Amino acid sequence: MKEMLLDKLKNCKKLVIMGIGNELKGDDAVGIYVVKKLMRYFGEEKEFINIKNLYLINAGTVPDFFTDILKEIKPTHILIIDCALMDKDVGEVKIIKEDEIINYSFSTHTLPLSIIVKYLKKFINAEIIILGIQPKIIDFCPISEEVKLSGDKLVNTLIEIIEELKLAK
């Protein structure tokens, strides 16, 4: 996964990592879980933080709310992390191509991810990377241990990449 992400993030000058999901719906929270852990590592946990050329956004169920902020930031790359029903093993992380978005069911946000990505492509000249994480359960419960473990591994990989690309220091 690290090599694939590094390849997608080559020439990255300004990175936005956006976590999407609903913390009340089990594994649907994984995007938020990852971003919150990154926030704690790089600074503080809020809805939005900026460290040098790294922007971390906890978008919750309203990623469309942050489109104006993204237009102001003008990132070169946007990494969206979301729970996705992909018929994969629980916790599996997959880079989802833009033309594959319609094949998967994403978490409980207000607008479909396909519409958000089309909007971002139209108004922001950025490479958009979508990471889907296969859930175990999407119900009123805590995030499952399997998906949490997968999220922790992704956090460690992202920290390595961010430090390697010198985006936050």
From Swiss-Prot:
<dbReference type="InterPro" id="IPR000671">
    <property type="entry name" value="Peptidase_A31"/>
</dbReference>
<dbReference type="InterPro" id="IPR004420">
    <property type="entry name" value="Pept_A31_hyd_mat_HycI"/>
</dbReference>
<dbReference type="GO" id="GO:0004175">
    <property type="term" value="F:endopeptidase activity"/>
</dbReference>
<keyword id="KW-0064">Aspartyl protease</keyword>
<protein>
    <recommendedName>
        <fullName>Putative hydrogenase maturation protease MJ0631</fullName>
        <ecNumber>3.4.23.-</ecNumber>
    </recommendedName>
</protein>
<dbReference type="GO" id="GO:0004190">
    <property type="term" value="F:aspartic-type endopeptidase activity"/>
</dbReference>
<dbReference type="InterPro" id="IPR023430">
    <property type="entry name" value="Pept_HybD-like_dom_sf"/>
</dbReference>
<comment type="similarity">
    <text>Belongs to the peptidase A31 family.</text>
</comment>
<dbReference type="GO" id="GO:0016485">
    <property type="term" value="P:protein processing"/>
</dbReference>
<dbReference type="GO" id="GO:0008047">
    <property type="term" value="F:enzyme activator activity"/>
</dbReference>
<keyword id="KW-0378">Hydrolase</keyword>
<keyword id="KW-0645">Protease</keyword>
<dbReference type="Pfam" id="PF01750">
    <property type="entry name" value="HycI"/>
</dbReference>
